[in-house]
Amino acid sequence: MMRSRFLLFIVFFSLSLFISSLIASDLGFCNEEMALVGGVGDVPANQNSGEVESLARFAVDEHNKKENALLEFARVVKAKEQVVAGTLHHLTLEILEAGQKKLYEAKVWVKPWLNFKELQEFKPASDAPAITSSDLGCKQGEHESGWREVPGDDPEVKHVAEQAVKTIQQRSNSLFPYELLEVVHAKAEVTGEAAKYNMLLKLKRGEKEEKFKVEVHKNHEGALHLNHAEQHHD
């Protein structure tokens, strides 16, 4: 009889410790552990980009509520994640602040099984250059000066191409809007705190396909300007 009671006590005590540790974790008493569980790594390629953008918008909204600010989300520049008691998302964001584009860094802690989401940090990326390697669609570690080829499917390159198409449309008298089909070829160059893009774009207008050579400049504030555009004939 005594032995059975002793065994029951051991089982009950073990369960109590386990439940207490879970409660402490869920209440957020694990900040020290968060930094120790896993290193920061790239977001998996198969992760939904819409999910990352949703976290980015959440971070901006939460910051605006807490600080009574009016920052506007523009795009996700870079996303990394860290396995903790859940996942800590490290985001570099392009933000519109009083009409000017600026870079911010945010950390969002997510525990999906509890439907828990919390903004841990939101600050200006003061040490980040205005033009980064990701702005040129280049791999980290590439530092050669001058013009270099960049992938046409890079998000930043596509963003620049789409802005160029919008400007071409604004300057056109056509009733049919231009649609970007493909970035056929792209080169980029960093000059000081600005960047230049030379691209060959395949566009569609109505049933007709056309190619345009464009040169786009990006200044230190992130503003894009279509410097030159002409039709290209193969």
Curated annotation (Swiss-Prot):
Which residues does the record list as Phosphoserine (modified residue)? Answer: S174
Tagged with keyword Acetylation: yes
Top-level taxonomic group: Eukaryota
Q: Which Pfam families does this UniProt record tie to the protein?
A: SQAPI
Subcellular localization is given as: Secreted
* Signal sequence segment: 1-24
PROSITE patterns attached to this UniProt entry: CYSTATIN
This entry's Gene Ontology molecular function terms read:
cobalt ion binding; cysteine-type endopeptidase inhibitor activity
Cellular component GO terms held in the UniProt record? cytosol; endoplasmic reticulum; extracellular region
Instruction: List residue numbers at the site (Reactive site).
Output: G38
Q: Where is the short sequence motif Secondary area of contact located?
A: 82-86
The segment annotated Disordered runs over 133-154
Q: Which GO terms describe its biological process?
A: defense response; hyperosmotic response; response to cold; response to oxidative stress; response to water deprivation
The family this protein is said to belong to: Belongs to the cystatin family. Phytocystatin subfamily.
PANTHER family documented for this protein: CYSTATIN FAMILY MEMBER (PTHR11413), CYSTEINE PROTEINASE INHIBITOR 6 (PTHR11413:SF110)
Q: What's the protein name?
A: Cysteine proteinase inhibitor 6
Specify the taxonomic lineage.
Eukaryota, Viridiplantae, Streptophyta, Embryophyta, Tracheophyta
